[in-house]
Amino acid sequence: MTDTGTLFLSQQDVINAGATDVDWVGAVLEQVFVLHEQQAFTAPPSSFLKRPECPHVADRIIGLSAHVGAPFDREGMKWIASSHINPEHGLPRANAVIILNDPVHRLPIAILEGALISAMRTAVVQALAARYLARADSESVGLVGAGRIGALTVWALSKWFPSIQHYRAFDQSADRLAAFVEHMATLGVTVEAVSSFQEALAEADMGIVATTESEPYVTASEFKRGSLFMNVSLMDPTFDLINAADKIVVDDWHQSVHSDRVLARMHREGLVTRDSIHGEFGAVVSGHIPGREDPDERIFWNPFGLAIEDIAVASAVYDQALAQGLGKSLQLVDQEWDVLF
């Protein structure tokens, strides 16, 4: 019988395998978007578990499954749970587990701590998008939402954009914002804390929203001419901000409009169609459509977040872990179990 061992990788194992290396993760994700453009993947709609007594947009469990083609050729699922009250209790907003299966026998080859992979791929995707969609001479970044995703995104941008001179951040929690500024300083990134989201975004060459707000509030006034607006959040930008964009770029059109996020709401009201957006990011990465063409154009980047990103990064981490002898082997399946039947 084929070996049925399953490799368990803790968060530290995932780190040791390279998951916090921005350049390495970025190279994996660039391949992913090329595969997306080539349709070399299978990814059904995400499965959402939401309870009526927990109406906040960030209170849910999502199951995202996918098969990613060569050179990864792996399939699996990310099971990610989120509660918007967690930070108030000193807990991470989101936690996740990723299960990888081999594509032939469908046996579980790995169980990975998935929150770090999920957060890193989210952050590095923004830096990758900035490479193609932001001005190369961008000097300022404005962030709303001083959480882990915001911190990792700023850190990733600092690695790839030495031209950035100013980072400004706002958060509704003054304590969280102060802790964020202090933490970023330990990473070598100086961030100025500001007193409003308008102050953070209005003059930013790259504007980032990474919050759990459930209603739109950021207007076109905070979308500077020549800037890139990264909608990492769920609902922050208003319709008028999105309408002000010269280009709208999404990671996956179908997923983007079959959700309860702001772009999907606009689509349901007939305000955004497939023909009215510039295109999908994979087409930009593959060179099939241009990214930024004009230093003055405003580009709205709307990443839904794709299962193929998680599975590809997890697959690369798994391969590195095997090569380095990391993790713990588990025997989930008893080869003799069928004697009972």
PLM ranges: what are they?
Residues 1-119, 127, 137, 279, ...:
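N-terminal ligand-binding/catalytic initiation module
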Residues 13-18, 242-340:
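Adenosine-phosphate binding glycine-rich loop
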Residues 133-140, 163, 224-225:
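Short helix-loop-beta connector
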Residues 146-147:
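Glycine-rich Rossmann-fold phosphate-binding loop(s) that bind the pyrophosphate
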Residues 150-151:
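N-terminal Rossmann-fold NAD(P) dinucleotide-binding loop
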Residues 157:
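Aromatic pocket-lining residues of Rossmann-like dinucleotide-binding sites
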Residues 160-184:
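NAD(P)-binding Rossmann-fold cofactor-contacting core
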